[in-house]
Regions:
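Acidic, small-polar-rich N-terminal luminal/periplasmic segments of exported/outer-membrane proteins
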Residues: 21, 38-181, 195-200, 552
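Conserved C-terminal beta-signal and adjacent last beta-strands/turns
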Residues: 29, 375, 387, 398-399, ...
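Outer-membrane beta-barrel translocator/receptor signature
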Residues: 132, 138, 146-149, 160-247, ...
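Acidic/polar loop-and-plug regions of large Gram-negative outer-membrane beta-barrel proteins
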Residues: 230-234, 242-243, 247-254, 258-326, ...
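Structural signature of Gram-negative outer-membrane beta-barrels, strongest in the C-terminal barrel
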Residues: 252-256, 377, 394-408, 449-574, ...
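Surface-exposed extracellular loop regions of Gram-negative outer-membrane beta-barrel proteins
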Residues: 271-285, 407-411, 483, 507-551, ...
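Membrane-embedded beta-barrel scaffold of Gram-negative outer-membrane proteins
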Residues: 324-338, 342-348, 544-627, 695
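Gram-negative outer-membrane beta-barrel transporters
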Residues: 470, 566, 571-573, 592-672, ...
Length: 733
């Protein structure tokens, strides 16, 4: 970064920004104090010893005002500057710089955390779940970060505070809040692809941005409006475009000295040509040989293997209100409510793995079939908690008591063309996708009736952090309940699950700068009713997936605060894990009895301040994750590299100009029966900033590596993004 942020009384140096990019945890419920200016509003020269930010309060893992150093969990944060400097547009792209997390296949329904496949509804906005898309590929995607002040990645489960469904880890986006200082920014972002297989600067994704904040009357009423409009954004694959409008509008009312009310409205309107995700895959270089074991390089990376009439739409509206009230000096209340409505639909012609399509590895002519899906989802989410502190002699208690509720009403429809009917009607050439036939859409395909599903989640939780001298013991207790009801083929399946969960941790202060910690937390996730109906083959007595998470770590400041580091050893296990298996009658949902999965490893997040002009940040994860029973016993879990590392380097040339270099590596991964090769990629950036202007030029995948990002359908693969030249220009006034 070229300059410092001024926060509150201008006490924050470049070291604060550096450290926060690695180990700062963002609040899942927090509304900044009205006087807290989280945006850059002033620039000063960088000089002197970096100041540590490790004592800053953080609530993502605890929902309590606990410092980073005192939080006994492994987590990483990317703030707005980190996202901008790396040209990261959404959570999926942010995974590139967060070891231990990575995206799955093209439909974006799950992501990997600590080797465990995790539903995307574990992505939260301001502490509440935010699916922001329909079921089953109907336009759902990992959320944009256009309005993110911070994005936090919590490794491991946290069922005590967030309830059922938190698997390998959760993600929380803290949205930008209204500020007391009036400021408006308008900008333009453009991403162009420059590669031999996509053409040079022929495919461009341009968006226009607005960020305006300040007081409306006096400082007791503030506003913030953020918007991003992409009129016709090109994907790197020819034939795929997106038109997208993102809007986030918020107010802040300060009612006296003790109460703040923050209503917020968010809107997403997304239209895609070229499909919703089913047909993202391309073929790779070993396909023509007739045998695929380890994927080769993607071929025709810049081509789309779906049809010219594939479309996808997604509209999502969210209204929320956050209330914070200071009850007494040491007691406060926080209440957060959100209502979300989403409609979505998608039509795709895709290459299925169905054997009835009669496709063969090595055979150039490949059959495809139509799929249509639609969703109409409604969510109500609510969280309220009381936090306070009491002392009994030499023992200090930091207490939290809360209630979390989610009500889901989902109507989901999905219909596939019969595979036998599709044979010969929609062929495409594996070697040249321009040679294809788009057959008619089967009658009634888009008229498939929706299958309604309702689900309610209740979570009552209690936390107590008991401090005696330099030792803090953190204990938690929660009652978790989930009720599901689903209608399919005239049959209603209702199920109810509940459990009492507990967790325990200890944080030991070694000295002023260093703490060690040990933590135990729980995971609890009932099986979705939709999966039971569609893939259970008559089996209905599925047990909830349960798990344990153990962490042992150290975090603190070293070398006169020039090095901030967090090192965590972890062990995670699961009982009653589920997995999809291709049987003679199609896909079936299997459940492995007892302890069935484990993941062990180490995570390192560090930031080094070498000089006032040069600093680096590192994220590394070693993950050994596999089934402990069954045919895949001991086999590394899908899409999970044993080694993942990212390194980001900043060099400040002068007060206006800076440069950056990012390096990323992942070791070999599995994709079912196939292997995905290891890779190394590099990103570079150049930045210019004044009081009124900032310009950034970032080239992702600067060496234009052509590799497999993930598996898709059958033996097709999702290619990585080619060399992307990102230019952003912003004017501030």
């Amino acid at each position: 970064m070229t300059n410092n942020k001024i926060l509150n009384m201008k006490k924050v140096s470049l070291g604060t920004v550096l450290i926060s990019s690695l180990v700062n945890q963002v609040s899942a419920q927090e509304v900044p104090d009205i006087g807290y200016e989280s945006d850059t509003i002033e620039h000063i020269a960088v000089s002197g010893r970096p100041m540590s930010d490790i004592e800053k309060p953080s609530t993502a893992a605890t929902k309590m005002d606990v410092s980073i150093k005192d939080t006994g969990r492994s987590m990483m944060e990317l703030d707005a500057d980190d996202l901008k400097m790396r040209a990261l547009q959404d959570v999926r792209e942010a995974f590139n710089y967060v070891a231990g997390f990575r995206a799955n296949g093209p439909a974006d329904r799950t992501y990997i955390a600590r080797g465990f496949s995790t539903s995307i509804d574990n992505v939260m906005v301001d502490g509440l779940r935010s699916l922001q898309g329909g079921e089953g590929g109907t336009g759902s995607k990992l959320p944009s970060t256009f309005n993110a002040e911070n994005t936090t990645f919590l490794r491991g489960p946290e069922a005590i505070l967030y309830g059922a469904g938190v698997a390998g880890g959760l993600i929380n986006i803290t949205s930008k809040k209204p500020q007391t200082t009036a400021k408006t920014s308008i900008g333009l972002n453009n991403r162009s692809y420059a590669s031999s297989d996509t053409g040079n600067f022929k495919r461009n994704d341009t968006s226009f941005n607005l960020d305006s904040t300040g007081p409306i009357t006096d400082e007791s009423v503030l506003y913030r409006v953020l918007a991003q409009y992409t009129p016709s954004g090109d994907h790197f694959q020819d034939g795929r475009e997106i038109e997208e409008l993102l809007l986030d509008a918020a107010l802040s009312f300060e009612l006296g000295e003790n109460t703040t009310i923050l209503p917020r409205f968010e809107r997403t309107d997304r239209k895609r040509t070229g499909g919703s995700g089913y047909a993202d895959g391309v073929f790779e270089s070993t396909f023509a040989s007739g045998e695929v074991t380890t994927y080769g390089k993607p071929i025709n990376r810049g081509k789309y293997y779906g049809s010219p009439i594939d479309v996808g739409e997604n509209e999502s509206t969210s209204a929320s209100v956050l209330i914070k009230h200071q009850i007494a000096e040491d007691w406060k209340l926080a209440a957060n409510f959100r209502h979300n409505e989403t409609t979505s639909n998608a039509l795709d012609l895709y290459i299925s793995d169905s054997s009835a399509l009669e496709n063969e590895v090595g055979k150039d002519l490949v059959n495809r079939k139509w799929v249509y899906s639609a969703g109409d989802d409604s969510y109500n989410l609510f969280d309220i908690n009381f936090e306070g502190k009491v002392e009994t002699g030499s023992i200090k208690h930091h207490l939290l008591a809360g209630y979390n509720y989610r009500d889901m009403d989902i109507k989901f429809a999905r219909s596939f063309q019969d595979s036998a009917d599709a044979v010969g009607k929609n062929p495409i050439s594996a070697s040249n996708p321009d040679q294809q036939v788009t057959g008619p859409i089967p009658d009634g395909l888009v008229d498939s009736p929706a299958k309604p599903r309702t689900q309610t989640d209740t979570n009552i939780y209690l936390k107590d952090r008991i401090s005696i001298g330099n030792t803090t013991i953190a204990a938690g207790l929660a009652y978790v309940k989930q009720d599901q009801e689903e209608l399919s083929s005239g049959e209603t399946i209702a199920s109810s699950f509940d459990d009492t969960l507990w967790d325990l941790g200890v944080v030991q202060k070694i000295n002023r700068d260093i703490n060690v910690f040990a933590t135990y937390s729980r995971a609890y996730e009932p099986v979705k009713g939709r999966y039971i109906i569609e893939y259970g083959n008559g089996k209905t007595d599925y047990k909830p997936v349960e798990g344990n998470n153990y962490e042992l770590g150290i975090k603190g400041d070293l070398l006169n605060n020039n090095l901030t580091a967090a090192v965590t050893l972890f062990a995670l296990d699961r009982s009653n894990s589920t997995k999809f298996n291709r049987g003679d009658d199609g896909w079936e949902l299997l459940q492995l009895d007892g302890k069935s999965f484990e993941s062990k490893g180490v995570e390192v997040d560090a930031a080094m301040y070498f000089s006032p002009k040069f600093n680096s940040s590192l994220s590394y994860a070693y993950t050994d994750a596999h089934d402990t029973v069954g045919d895949d016993k001991g086999v590394q879990s899908n899409n999970t590299p044993k080694h993942a590392v990212s390194l980001w380097n900043n060099y400040t040339f002068d007060k206006n100009i800076s440069f950056a270099l990012g390096l990323r590596y992942e070791s070999e991964r599995n994709d079912g029966d196939y292997k995905i090769k290891s890779y190394f990629e590099a990103d570079v950036g150049a930045y210019y900033k004044t009081d009124d202007w900032d310009v950034a030029l970032v080239v992702n995948n600067v060496l234009d590596k052509n590799r497999v990002e993930a598996g898709a359908n059958w033996v097709t693969v999702q290619p990585n993004t080619p060399r992307a030249v990102n230019l952003s220009l912003n004017y501030h006034f």
